[in-house]
A protein has these predicted regions:
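N-terminal active-site segment of His-dependent metallophosphoesterases
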Residues: 1-51
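Residue-level marker for buried hydrophobic side chains located in beta-strands
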Residues: 5, 32-34, 64-65, 135, ...
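Active-site glycine-centered loops adjacent to acidic/histidine catalytic or metal-binding residues
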Residues: 8, 37, 67-68, 177, ...
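Short, glycine/acidic-enriched loop or turn micro-motifs at the edges of active sites
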Residues: 10-11, 40, 71, 141, ...
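Glycine-rich phosphate-binding loop signature in dinucleotide/nucleotide-binding domains
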Residues: 25-28, 58, 129-131
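Active-site neighborhood of divalent metal-dependent phosphoester bond hydrolases
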Residues: 41-126, 162-163
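Acidic, His/Gly-enriched loop-helix segments that form or flank divalent-metal centers
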Residues: 93-213, 231
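Short, basic/aromatic-enriched C-terminal tail that caps enzymatic domains
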Residues: 214-233
């Protein structure tokens, strides 16, 4: 049985499917951990969720975390379902980071028209997962407070943190959220003494920069790192 941790997919279903089926060759004995941001930027947000839902329905061991882009979507959906004269601020913020491609993938023009099953799926996403040697989270944890696991906002939105190992039982943080170069991902994986985190997001949608534009998969048991280049954009 293998464990695979996969960060921000951002609406790239062909890339995800090729990574899982052709490179990882997943089986129902494996465990898959997704770090959030399934939607936006790429053209197939709905298709990404459909594919993951299909894996879940077919008995694969799938664990899904919430990302800030799902939070954008949920907040926009809730705001759009309330009476208003002007477009809600959160909806404008979401549009600035790729809402248009997600709405188009659902065949709708407004957040409130996204089908309820997808909204329910996003609402049910976890904020973090604890493994023996790692804590998985979309963005990071707030170590400035006594209990970093109480701050769910930081889990999907923070952009910087310094791990307090006394609050993680000595475990490193594995996260996505902020795109980093492939060489940096490889560096932090193999230098636990120098880095208290492993950043896995290679910016799958950043296809115009060297060292970027891959969807990553990381095996925390043997430090294997697999990259699939973008096939959707």
């Amino acid at each position: 049985m293998s464990k695979w941790i996969i960060p921000d997919i951002h609406g790239c279903p062909r890339t995800l499917q090729t990574l899982l089926e052709n490179l990882l060759k997943i089986s129902k004995n494996d465990e898959l951990f997704f770090l959030g941001d399934y939607i936006d930027r790429g053209p197939g947000g709905k298709e990404v969720i459909d594919y993951i839902m299909e894996l879940q329905a077919n008995g694969y061991h799938v664990h899904c975390l919430k990302g800030n882009h799902e939070d954008y979507c949920l907040q926009s959906w809730e705001a759009d379902n309330k009476p208003h004269l002007f477009k809600p601020k959160v909806q404008k913020s979401w549009e600035a980071v790729g809402a248009g491609t997600t709405l188009k993938s659902f065949g709708v023009k407004r957040p409130r028209d996204i089908p309820q099953p997808y909204i329910n799926w996003m609402k049910d996403l976890k904020y973090y997962i604890e493994l023996e040697h790692y804590i998985l989270v979309h963005a990071g944890l707030n170590f400035h407070i006594k209990d970093p696991f109480a701050d769910t906002h930081s889990m999907i939105w923070t952009r910087s943190f310094k791990v307090d190992f006394s609050k993680t039982d000595g475990r490193r943080i594995i996260h996505g959220h902020i795109p980093v170069d492939y060489s940096f991902i490889d560096l932090v994986i193999h230098n636990p003494a120098g880095y208290d985190f492993i950043a896995l997001d290679n910016g799958v949608f950043v296809t115009d920069k060297p060292g970027m534009g891959n969807l990553m998969a990381f095996n925390p048991d043997d430090n294997t790192l697999i990259a699939q280049s973008n096939l959707d954009m």
